[in-house]
UniProtKB/Swiss-Prot annotation:
Family: Belongs to the universal ribosomal protein uL29 family.
SUPFAM superfamilies: Ribosomal protein L29 (L29p) (SSF46561)
Gene Ontology BP terms: translation
InterPro entries: Ribosomal_uL29 (IPR001854), Ribosomal_uL29_sf (IPR036049)
Protein name per the record: Large ribosomal subunit protein uL29
HAMAP family given in the database record: Ribosomal_uL29
Pfam families: Ribosomal_L29
GO cellular component, one term: ribonucleoprotein complex
Molecular functions (GO terms): structural constituent of ribosome
UniProt feature coiled coil, ranges: none
Keyword field: Ribonucleoprotein, Ribosomal protein
Amino acid sequence: MDIVDIRSKTSDELRELLASLRKELVDAVLNRKIDKSGNHFYCVNIKRDIARVLTVLNERKKEERHV
């Protein structure tokens, strides 16, 4: 997921996306532990997407404080 796509979403949409990404990460980790053949980088990419979403949400929160 691109940062441009993330920045174009509203804060509510980002919170929903964050929740779904966290669920997806849990599922991916569990599947990886069960199968032992899962792709490690898939989990890494989900974690990076979560970090991007959290970064944008925190930036918006800081902007609200300063306005």
